[in-house]
């Protein structure tokens, strides 16, 4: 069994095991007890960190990615290996934060430390000028509202979110007429 299957690596102790004697497994790097699977038998995959049934994919076999919840084709990257981040829409270098992993929030300009909040991950909020703590509120996350002078609780009214309208003496909706700003 050993001589007919394992060929040049028959002298290795692990190659004498019956579960390793398959044509697809007979490689120097693959004749190991826990690594003899067709999908696992590649040099870059036969590592101690990759010996899991759920982790034998070529794209998954890196030390920081070999975990059951990380072995997906679109999620096998070091920065993506978090339980809350292993999704197709979240596996990006700048977007793998637990609070950032929603489809509408996974954009480079939105995934910042000050912007990755559950209350701020909305399409209307994900612009570079809107990603700061004072702007990420339900009543303030609008592109036209999210500029530094406008980002305040008082100024972000539904009818009054024009930069030219929000001044210290005119923070109320009744002041925001076109002739009043």
Swiss-Prot record:
GO cellular component, one term: cytosol
Sequence repeats, residue ranges: 5-9, 20-24, 25-29, 30-34, 35-39, 40-44, 45-49, 55-59, 60-64, 65-69, 70-74, 75-79, 80-84, 85-89, 90-94, 95-99, 100-104, 105-109, 110-114, 115-119, 120-124, 125-129, 130-134, 135-139, 140-144, 145-149
Tissue specificity annotation: Expressed in the hair follicles.
Keyword Repeat annotated: yes
GO annotation terms (biological process): hair cycle
Region listing for 26 X 5 AA repeats of C-C-[GRQVCHIEK]-[SPTR]-[VSTQYC], in residue ranges: 5-154
Keywords annotated in UniProt: Keratin, Repeat
Protein known as: Keratin-associated protein 4-5
The organism of origin for this protein: Homo sapiens
Lineage of producing organism: Eukaryota, Metazoa, Chordata, Craniata, Vertebrata
Gene: KRTAP4-5
